[in-house]
């Protein structure tokens, strides 16, 4: 299995920056405690903090799937307050690619 890299661009909805930052911090806390195959998981804000780049690296597809399961409802809360686009780099498993 190969390493998987994710790059997400999140445009934060107006008035939701504080909530986004709170949720991002909680996502990072959960990832540090529960994830076993996460290599890197970082949030980078633009100058006016209207957008955030999330740079993620995982040991393999199974590690990314574990991360998504660990975040659970938190991910839904984040997605509700921003518009997200992104890329997955590497060779994700068929389950991850189709899931």
Feature roles, as predicted:
Residues 44-48:
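Short beta-strand micro-motifs enriched in acidic
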Residues 30-39, 57-99:
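An amphipathic, aromatic/His-enriched active-site/gating alpha helix that lines ligand/cofactor pockets
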